[in-house]
Amino acid sequence: MAIKLNGSSRSFVPSLRVSAFLIFIFFVITYIIIYNVSFSEPSWITQDALKQNIENLDDYDASCSGYSIGRILREQKRILASVRLELTESQVKIEEIRTVQEELQRLIPQKQLELSALEGEIEAAQRQLEELRETQNVKVFLPFSPLQIPRELEQPSQISPNQLDDIIDYSRCSISSFMPVYVDIITSGQSEKEWLNVFQEVIPNLVETPDKACIKIHISNGIASPNTTFNSILFNVGSPIINFQSKSIHVQASKIRSFDFPVDVNHIAVEKVDLTPLLPFQRENLISLIVDNTELNFSAFSSLSAEPSRRPIVIVKCSQENCSLERRRQLIGSSTFCFLLPSEMFFQDFLSSLQLGCIPIILSNSQLLPFQDLIDWRRATYRLPLARLPEAHFIVQSFEISDIIEMRRVGRLFYETYLADRHLLARSLLAALRYKLQIPTREVRRNQAIPLFNSSFTAPKGSVVNVQANFDDEYLLGPLESRVESTSYAYNFTEFQLYSYDFWNIIMSPHYTKEFLVNAAELPTEAEFFEDTKIGFRPIEPGSGAEFSKALGGNRQREQFTVVLLTYERDAVLTGALERLHQLPYLNKIIVVWNNVNRDPPDTWPSLHIPVEFIRVAENNLNNRFVPWDRIETEAVLSLDDDIDLMQQEIILAFRVWRENRDRIVGFPARHHARYGDSMFYNSNHTCQMSMILTGAAFIHKNYLTAYTYEMPAEIREHVNSIKNCEDIAMNYLVSHLTRKPPIKTTSRWTLKCPTCTESLYKEGTHFEKRHECMRLFTKIYGYNPLKFSQFRADSILFKTRLPQNHQKCFKYV
C-alpha cells in the first residue's frame, strides 16, 4: 500500500507541470486575442467617423490606439515635409532681409556723404545769407560832379603851363562820363583827313559837338589852333609847333614839354611778316650809330670805333646821299645795339630799332620817349649820358645773351602794341589820356551771344539725368553751392595807379577797362577770420581730406567756373558729356557753342543742376571756342571738347590748381615741340618735359579769350579757320608769349580718347602735318617761338601718401 502511494505521487508531479504550461499557453493566447481585438477596427465604426476621431486628437502619442502604424508614418512624413517647406521659405526670407540689410549698410556711407553735402550746402547758404545781409544796405548812387575850380583865362603869352592841371578842366570830365571826345581838323590836308578817320573809328565815346566833350582833339599840319581852350589836344602831323605857352597838349615828334606826348605820327608801318626774327642772336654789326646832328664834333665818336671787337662798330655821318630811310633801316636791322642821339630823326630811328630788334642805346638822360610815364622803357632800352660814350662798348658787351633777347622781345611787343600803325597809336593816345584823367571806359559788350532756341538759351525740354551723384567712392568733392558770378569791373580806378604798371608793361592792354584782372592782389591768409574781411571766403577747417572737401579754401574768395563746350555733329556724345557734369561742385554754368550751322538742335537735352545755355554762331569756326561771350560770368573758364571723359575729381583738382596759377593754362593732355634737323615739329609722344596743354580739357582765364579774339595777330585766327585745326596751339603760343611761363599739367592723363566717337579731327591723316606747319607759321608771325618747357605736373598734396587710419586723402585717385 505504501508503494502505490509513492508511485502515485511521482506521476502526479509531471501532470501538474503540463497543466501549468497549458494554463500559461491559454493565458498567452487569450492575451493575444484580446490585444488584437482592442487594436482592430470594429465593423460598426465607419471610416468617416474614424477620420473625425483622428482629426480631434490633440496628442498623437496619447491616442495612438486609434491609428495604424502606416497612417502614423504617413502623417509624420506630411508634417516633416510641411516643416521643411516652412524652413525653406523662412531661409529665403532671411536671405532677402540680409540682402536688404547689406544694401542699407552699403548705402550708409553714401547717405552720410549726401548728408555732409547737404550740410555743406546749408552752411554755404547760411554764409551767403549773412553776406547778403551785410551788403544789402549799401547805397548805390552816381558820384558827384567834379569841383569847378575858378580859373583866369590868361592869354598864352602871359603864362606857361607846367603841369597837366594847368590845361585840364576836370569839371568837364566826370569819372562817370566815360571821357567823351570830340575830334576835328584845323588844316585840310590828306594826312589830316586820314587821321580824322582813324580817330573816328577808334574813339569809344565820340561826340559831335565840342561843348559835350571832355577832350577835344584838333588835327593840324604845323599850325597852332587860333582858339586855345582847356582840355585841347593838338595832334600835329607836320613840322613841330614851337609854342611853350600853349594851353593845348601837343602830340608831335619834337619841341615838347613834360606833359606833351612825344610821338612820330608819320612813322611808316611795315607788315608784321617782314619783321626781323629775334633769333639768331648774332648780327653783322655789334653797334651802329647814325650822327645827324652837325653841331656835334664827329671826331668825338672816333674812340668808340677804335674799340676792339670781333664784330664791326659802324658809325655813319648822315648826309642827304647816305641817310635815306631804306639805308637807315638796313643798318639798324643788321646791328645788335643802335646808339641813338637826340635829333629830328630820333623817333624814326627809335621806332625802327624796336621794330627790327636792335636794342636802342639812348645817349641822353633827357630825351623823352613815347608815353614814358606809363611805358617802362627800361625793359627794352638802355640810357647813357653822352659823356659815357667811350665806356659804352664795355657796358653793352657785358649784357647776357638772355637779357639782350628779352630786350628785343619786349621792345618788339611795345612797338606792336602801342606804336605799329595809326590805329594803335590813336588808341594808345586815348588810353594815356584816360589814365591821366582817371576815367574808366564804357562797358562794351562786343560778344553778345545769340540764343540757339529762338529767344531762349536753354532747351525747351529737359530729360532727367539718371547718373547718380559722383562721390568718388566715399570721397566728397565739395558742396553744391548756389551759383555765384565773379565780381566784374572791380578795378575800374585802381587800374590807373596800383595796376597801371601791369596794364601797360605786363599784360599790355590798357585800352579798355577790364572786366576781370588776372593777377589781382590777394588778402593775407588770416583775412578769412576777421569780421570785416571774411566775406566770400570759405576757409578749410584743420584736418585732412574730409575737412578739405567741405570748403574751397585757398587764398581768394569763393568762385566758380564756366564750362565752354564746343560741339559739332555729335549729339549723342554731347549728351553724355553733359550728363557727366551733373552735380559737379563749383560749376556755375555750361555754355554749348553749337557749331552745327546747317541744322537746328533737338529740343530735349539733359536737365542739370545748373543752366545749360546753347549759343548760335555764324560759321563752323574753331575760334568760336575762345570768344569771350558775354554769357561767361566767371573768371575761370573750362574749355572742353564734347568727346572728353574726365572724372569729376580730376576737374576739381585742376580748378583748385588754376586758382593758384591764374595766369597760366592748367589742364590734362600735354604735348611738346621738338626739333628734328632744321625744322620744328609738334610732338605727342610721351616725354619728361612738355610745353603745351591741349585746350580740349583746360582751365583758362577769360581775359585770355579776349586777348585771343582781339589782340592776337589776326593772321593766326585766319589760319586756324582755314585749316580747321591748331586753335589749341595758338592759345598756348599766346599765353606763353604774354606771360613767359609754361602751362601746368595735372594728373597722369596723357590722352583723352573717346571710344564711342566715330569721327575726330585727330584721326585725319593730315592732322599732324597741319600742326607741324602751324608751329612754324606762328613762330614766324611772333618772330620767335614763345613756348616754354615744364618738367613737372601737379597732383594733390596727399596723393600717394601713407596716412593714419583716421585720416583721408584730398582726392582718392589724383
From Swiss-Prot:
<dbReference type="GO" id="GO:0005794">
    <property type="term" value="C:Golgi apparatus"/>
</dbReference>
<dbReference type="GO" id="GO:0050508">
    <property type="term" value="F:glucuronosyl-N-acetylglucosaminyl-proteoglycan 4-alpha-N-acetylglucosaminyltransferase activity"/>
</dbReference>
<keyword id="KW-0328">Glycosyltransferase</keyword>
<feature type="binding site">
    <location>
        <position position="570"/>
    </location>
    <ligand>
        <name>UDP-N-acetyl-alpha-D-glucosamine</name>
    </ligand>
</feature>
<dbReference type="GO" id="GO:0046872">
    <property type="term" value="F:metal ion binding"/>
</dbReference>
<dbReference type="GO" id="GO:0000139">
    <property type="term" value="C:Golgi membrane"/>
</dbReference>
<feature type="topological domain" description="Cytoplasmic">
    <location>
        <begin position="1"/>
        <end position="14"/>
    </location>
</feature>
<dbReference type="Pfam" id="PF09258">
    <property type="entry name" value="Glyco_transf_64"/>
</dbReference>
<dbReference type="Pfam" id="PF03016">
    <property type="entry name" value="Exostosin_GT47"/>
</dbReference>
<dbReference type="InterPro" id="IPR040911">
    <property type="entry name" value="Exostosin_GT47"/>
</dbReference>
<dbReference type="GO" id="GO:0019899">
    <property type="term" value="F:enzyme binding"/>
</dbReference>
<keyword id="KW-0256">Endoplasmic reticulum</keyword>
<feature type="binding site">
    <location>
        <position position="595"/>
    </location>
    <ligand>
        <name>UDP-N-acetyl-alpha-D-glucosamine</name>
    </ligand>
</feature>
<dbReference type="GO" id="GO:0050509">
    <property type="term" value="F:N-acetylglucosaminyl-proteoglycan 4-beta-glucuronosyltransferase activity"/>
</dbReference>
<feature type="glycosylation site" description="N-linked (GlcNAc...) asparagine">
    <location>
        <position position="36"/>
    </location>
</feature>
<dbReference type="GO" id="GO:0160094">
    <property type="term" value="P:nematode pharynx development"/>
</dbReference>
<dbReference type="GO" id="GO:0008375">
    <property type="term" value="F:acetylglucosaminyltransferase activity"/>
</dbReference>
<keyword id="KW-0325">Glycoprotein</keyword>
<keyword id="KW-0812">Transmembrane</keyword>
<feature type="glycosylation site" description="N-linked (GlcNAc...) asparagine">
    <location>
        <position position="297"/>
    </location>
</feature>
<dbReference type="GO" id="GO:0042328">
    <property type="term" value="F:heparan sulfate N-acetylglucosaminyltransferase activity"/>
</dbReference>
<keyword id="KW-0333">Golgi apparatus</keyword>
<dbReference type="GO" id="GO:0016757">
    <property type="term" value="F:glycosyltransferase activity"/>
</dbReference>
<feature type="binding site">
    <location>
        <position position="771"/>
    </location>
    <ligand>
        <name>UDP-N-acetyl-alpha-D-glucosamine</name>
    </ligand>
</feature>
<dbReference type="InterPro" id="IPR015338">
    <property type="entry name" value="GT64_dom"/>
</dbReference>
<dbReference type="GO" id="GO:0001888">
    <property type="term" value="F:glucuronyl-galactosyl-proteoglycan 4-alpha-N-acetylglucosaminyltransferase activity"/>
</dbReference>
<dbReference type="InterPro" id="IPR004263">
    <property type="entry name" value="Exostosin"/>
</dbReference>
<feature type="binding site">
    <location>
        <position position="642"/>
    </location>
    <ligand>
        <name>UDP-N-acetyl-alpha-D-glucosamine</name>
    </ligand>
</feature>
<keyword id="KW-0464">Manganese</keyword>
<dbReference type="GO" id="GO:0015012">
    <property type="term" value="P:heparan sulfate proteoglycan biosynthetic process"/>
</dbReference>
<feature type="topological domain" description="Lumenal">
    <location>
        <begin position="36"/>
        <end position="814"/>
    </location>
</feature>
<feature type="binding site">
    <location>
        <position position="625"/>
    </location>
    <ligand>
        <name>UDP-N-acetyl-alpha-D-glucosamine</name>
    </ligand>
</feature>
<feature type="binding site">
    <location>
        <position position="643"/>
    </location>
    <ligand>
        <name>Mn(2+)</name>
    </ligand>
</feature>
<keyword id="KW-0735">Signal-anchor</keyword>
<feature type="transmembrane region" description="Helical; Signal-anchor for type II membrane protein">
    <location>
        <begin position="15"/>
        <end position="35"/>
    </location>
</feature>
<dbReference type="GO" id="GO:0006486">
    <property type="term" value="P:protein glycosylation"/>
</dbReference>
<comment type="similarity">
    <text>Belongs to the glycosyltransferase 47 family.</text>
</comment>
<dbReference type="GO" id="GO:0048598">
    <property type="term" value="P:embryonic morphogenesis"/>
</dbReference>
<comment type="pathway">
    <text>Glycan metabolism; heparan sulfate biosynthesis.</text>
</comment>
<keyword id="KW-1133">Transmembrane helix</keyword>
<keyword id="KW-0808">Transferase</keyword>
<feature type="binding site">
    <location>
        <position position="727"/>
    </location>
    <ligand>
        <name>UDP-N-acetyl-alpha-D-glucosamine</name>
    </ligand>
</feature>
